Amino acid sequence: MLKLLASVLTLTFALTGCGESPQPESSATSDSASAVNNTANATALTVYKSPTCGCCEDWITHMEGEGFEAAIEHPSRMATIKAELGIAPEYGSCHTGVSEEGYVFEGHVPAKLVRQFLDNPPENALGLAVPRMPVGSPGMEMGERFDPYDVLLLKTDGSSEIYARIETPEQQY
């Protein structure tokens, strides 16, 4: 029973946001010179997230710094959005990015790997996922702390495989 309760609480936390104070929408909505310069060659993503998730904002900042443009949506039912996109609960994290082509990027996937994926999408791919919220992944930086993690290739048949193993912070950039 305790194990079930812990699982439910973990999933609830991941799907409803990180519990941090609301932050500004995104620098994508600002008039800063850097945002204007990056927009001309930017790859657009729609990012679904809780309005109170600070680590989601940090991931968006990471993506924008690497030439992506984020349009932010705050749906009231994140689990429904994820299910509609074909993301199984075991791959869940706190936010979901969707490319113009319809590929999904679940969680704290490094921009480098999103770009690599979009440049050469594997056959039958749904997208990439970093389940949960690994410490040290883009948007989850905590000083010098870093936990190695896998980036998963999600397939349209519901299966997954390892797309990349991230063993060091440097491999993310």
Model features per residue range: what roles?
Residues 52, 59, 74-77, 110-114:
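Stable alpha-helical elements in mature extracytoplasmic
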Residues 27-42:
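A short beta-strand-turn-helix
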Residues 84, 90-173:
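Thiol/selenol-based redox catalytic cores and closely related redox-interacting motifs
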Residues 38-60, 99:
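Local sequence-structure signature of Cys/Sec-based thiol-disulfide redox active-site neighborhoods
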Residues 1-6:
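Bacterial N-terminal signal peptides that target proteins for export
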